[in-house]
Amino acid sequence: MKSVCMVALGTMLVIVCGSSLLSAQEYDFDENSRLNTNIAIPVVAPVNPTARFTNFGVGFTAGAGYNMSPRNAFVGEFMWNRLFPSNSAITPLRLALHSRSLKGYGNLLAFTGNYKFELRGKSLGTYFIGGGGFYYRSVTLSQEVVTGTAIACTPEWVFWGFVCSSGVVSSDQTLANTSSAAPGFNAGMGFTIKVGEPRYRLYFEARYHYAATTPANTQLIPITFGIRF
């Protein structure tokens, strides 16, 4: 529920910011407009150590910002990704419960401020983008897991938020979800293709994201497909 609320809050902030920028425009919506917006669907490719626990992810990205010049812009973005754990990340818990029905998933939310440098032609363009912000990651199990004794502490147990001591998982822990929030940064590049007036452009982007979440940091590369205005 908390993750759903944050997704809704992030989307609302993007809409409000975009509306404020829109109402403040003194220019027509041509190639020289001061407003920039984007909406897209990212497909996530995790990078180690995240790749050890997650196969892939998919989500939603929306942003709005201010064009300082034709090449330089500020972009505020909200990103949400649903992360799907690998079998190896959940197998130790299934073995401990003697249940193959146990499932899990993760949510990653990010609020970032970014600088974009763009080289735009009449039809094609390319850009570099990077910045920083706040990242929130949560992982949830389909049922509570109660730890017993003498369970070897592996990174998979730590990923789900369990505490270890002297090389074993501490006994009598009951856990169904855990979360971590941390600052982070991102950097990447993309390509644009003009598809309509006044300046709609499809964009394809790859951007590396890092956040110092615990117990394992978050590293991933969303491959994003969307439209910029």
Task: Give the ranges of each region predicted by the language model.
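Bacterial N-terminal signal peptides that target proteins for export
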Residues: M1-L9
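Extracellular loop and loop/strand-boundary signature of outer-membrane beta-barrel proteins
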Residues: P46-T50, A96-K103, S171-N177, H209-T213
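Outer-membrane beta-barrel biogenesis signature
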Residues: V14-N38
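Residue-level detector of the transmembrane beta-barrel scaffold of outer-membrane proteins
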Residues: N36-N38, A73-V75, Y127-I129, R201-E205, ...
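Gram-negative (and chloroplast) outer-membrane scaffold detector with strong preference
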Residues: Q25-Y27, I41-V43, V58, G63-I151, ...
